[in-house]
Amino acid sequence: MKPTKKHISDKALNQFNENGVVNVRLQHIADAAFVSVGHLAYHFKNKDGIIDALYDELKTKQEILLTEFRIVPLFEDVNRYLKSIYQLHSAYIFFYLDTLEILRAYPTIQTRHSQHLRWQLMQIKTMLDFNISRGAFIFLTYQQRLQLAWQIRSMVEMWRYMVRIENSENETEENFLYCIWGILKPFFSDMG
């Protein structure tokens, strides 16, 4: 059996994913976890504490994926990384659908997330640098690499949100991969 704090955060994650952050109260989380609000408050002072803990989990998992990915970012590693990111985004979908609301309501998360996005951008740029140096991509200037890294990172971070806004039925891993590789494909060299 899971420790109570982890059980509560897992149930909160399910509630946020299903209903959105703004629509979930502590009572909903307590009911889902089969604990009293008082018992929940023993582990998490308030909803802010739960969201903060979930963001830390998400960020840590993303950093692990990016750290593993940057060791040798060959195309099969890039694809494996993208599949893992898709799965991670699925598990924490509330964050990607409610990003702006969360960042407005939780300034400390906004600060940490901004730092994380900058780090993520540099990791993607490093992947581009590596693949350009091995001849898999055409030559790009520093500014072009940064812009391409920004486009990839933006698509990765916002893809779910856009698919939901469009009310599309294409919210699949296959379509996610197709969109990201579609950004990269024009930059493949003959070798790539």
Go through the PLM ranges and name each one.
Residues 155, 161-192:
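C-terminal peripheral helix-coil segments that are non-catalytic and often amphipathic
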Residues 89-111, 125-129:
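Amphipathic alpha-helical segments used for helix-helix packing
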Residues 67-94:
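Hydrophobic alpha-helical connector segments
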Residues 7, 11, 15-49, 53:
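Helix-turn-helix
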Residues 57, 84, 88-91, 115, ...:
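Charged, amphipathic alpha-helical oligomerization/scaffolding segments
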Residues 56-62:
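Short, basic, alpha-helical segments at the C-terminal edge of helix-turn-helix-like DNA-binding modules
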